[in-house]
């Protein structure tokens, strides 16, 4: 019977023939004790695309969003179904391969790639919207570029990230801050249930009533710790058009007015439950596109009328030097791009270092002047600081209800330092980042946002999870006892003795509830 093969099936046949032919010249690195027959078997069993070091496009496939810490995977598997993931886990176990899990490849510290096996779930991106029950079910590889329009068709919304190519798997497991989080909560707060495949291939469903410790841990405990996230069910919210806003203050020659603006933003919006319908990201950047001056940019998304917006921002507009750069109404996905895209205006193919710290106390105008002056010493004009505004629904969510514990902060203060071959200052950027955050320690509450990991972060266990870290270790040992998913900042390291004393345990050790399929 005549039948047609897909292009991928044709490619797979050619790969298997190459691996099994007597004259094949595939070189397997000596550190891997794997036969060519095993590779051919894996290629044949996997439904999705398998990329080997000799495959066309390998160099592009192995790269992450940032690629500061490049890896050379032995194999990359684009899972086309859940069985592909199960096969990969067994293959990695038998052949003692390190595993990295990847969805959107947006890990700041490149933790979604390794020199062993990369399991990529970006092809798993089904979406089912149930507007009548205010829920959406998505697979782990779904990007916000796909999810936002699917929700907007029904006039619905889920808080999401600033970059549309981010996928829900990594984003949700680190918490997930977005422009509407002050009104609707952190992304992981909206999770009602998820399905995960554990390292032994078994499936678990976690929600407030089943596997409750895992439900708590995954929502903030970061990816690559407990298992492979397969799908998530979220609560969603009605949302129509919103306003996008940008106001700038120049501090190239005098930081006074810009510092007053930062202080006003803090006092008027970020302390207490003030104006939650105003989402805030305040940036320090160099305006390369216009006058090359350093500026403060108040970026915002507002849910309400123009008159209400004008009333809310009146205090900011009264500060000398305030310049409206954008004021426009549109869909959330458009506003999100308008407010954040292109700041700073960096060339293509740049790399970056990123790091964050949380601020809980009110800073003075003099404090902000000092921060602005330090920012002026950044290595190049691509550098930026983003002060993500907290408060509102973010801080109303109980601290112990998920492992995203940062509920007392006024802002997440994070820095991105970009560099490329032309700037030729990678190490200078890395060292300046350390100096900057040593300076910022006087203002910090000692914690950092786990979705912005930095490999130079000392004491990340306390910085990301504070007094709940030990509960995360216990939960990981329960669901991933062999520590199959491991990387530099994976859960499992020890705390300082004084931090150990402050640890809070939340759950009894109930048995794992497995699914029957």
Where are these regions (language model features)?
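Soluble FAD-dependent oxygen oxidases
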Residues: 1-517
